Amino acid sequence: MKTFAETAKAYLALTKPRVIELLLVATIPAMLQAARGEVNFGLILLTLIGGWMGAGAANTFNNVVDHDIDQLMRRTRRRPTARQTVSVGEARVFAWVLLIASVLWLGFLCHSWLAAGFIVLTNWFYVFVYTKWLKRRTWQNVIWGGAAGCMPVIVGWAVITDNNGGAFHAGWSSWLQAIILFMIIFFWTPPHTWALGMRYREDYEAAGVPMMPVVKPPLQVTRQILAYTWAAVITSLLLVPAASWIYLAAALISGGWFIIKAHMLHQGVKNGTPVKPMQLFFLSNNYLSILFVALSVDAVLGWQTLAHAVLG
């Protein structure tokens, strides 16, 4: 019989805390930039809790749907539903509880039913479009399915706008920044995930998941990794006018580092030399963290944006 601590640990594992950690890192800079120069720590904390429950629900639903293929992969076979430490039925109930709690939390405590709606939309897309359909049918699963992982910035932005006059009051220029943040993560996701796929290619193949590294030649994979890396870095520069030199410096330095590492991986595959794709995987995490920490600092300080400095 499992102890309470063991049961709690298993349920926590269903939410994939490491994945959520990265998602929440994206929520904070979005909220700070949306309220540039003004910091409401209480609202940010409440949003993070609501966002954690929403993301935890999506990840738990993912465990429910994928429990069969998780049993076939070394990287995932220790997940609670794969090991049956938590039954599929119990996990499904837990996911629904988290989702409902997230919606009510964001709606009533964060005063943003728009953000709550985005949480529902994200869960629907992640579970039905990505997990049940794209993931098992096409190598483009990561490209389009990755849109769900971009939603924390939209949720965070929605909370701020709903607490400052509403989404329509914010105007298109404000939401354009949110869309740019969304697209940064959208373009960042494929190189991040395909690098992992190159390392665990045999696992995905054994589970019948058509990840790009499984169905395409390595050179084609690294070529796509390179293209999406460039796209992510270039997109990050679109936010420069709405920030100061702090963000600009971080975007250029970390972006250059990201591109160089992607080029090294591609060149290694092209030359037929041994490569270490996990180096790019971990570096991609560092890139996004550096970029968003810099944006957070930039927004909190509220220094003059480069657009105002140039245009007056």
From Swiss-Prot:
Subcellular location: Cell membrane
GO CC entries: plasma membrane
Its EC number(s): 2.5.1.141
Pathway: Porphyrin-containing compound metabolism; heme O biosynthesis; heme O from protoheme: step 1/1
Catalytic activity: heme b + (2E,6E)-farnesyl diphosphate + H2O = Fe(II)-heme o + diphosphate
Keywords, comma-separated and alphabetical: Cell membrane, Heme biosynthesis, Membrane, Transferase, Transmembrane, Transmembrane helix
Source species, domain of life: Bacteria
Listed Pfam families: UbiA
One annotated GO molecular function: protoheme IX farnesyltransferase activity
InterPro entries referenced in this protein's UniProt entry, alphabetically: Protohaem_IX_farnesylTrfase, UbiA_prenyltransferase, UbiA_sf
A biological process term (GO) from this entry: heme O biosynthetic process
The protein's enzyme class: transferase
UniProt keyword Nucleotide-binding present: no
Membrane topology value: Multi-pass membrane protein
Major location (coarse): membrane
Further details from the record: Carbon 2 of the heme B porphyrin ring is defined according to the Fischer nomenclature.
Biological role stated in the UniProt entry: Converts heme B (protoheme IX) to heme O by substitution of the vinyl group on carbon 2 of heme B porphyrin ring with a hydroxyethyl farnesyl side group.
Family named by the database record: Belongs to the UbiA prenyltransferase family. Protoheme IX farnesyltransferase subfamily.
Protein name (database record): Protoheme IX farnesyltransferase
Species assigned in the record: Corynebacterium jeikeium (strain K411)
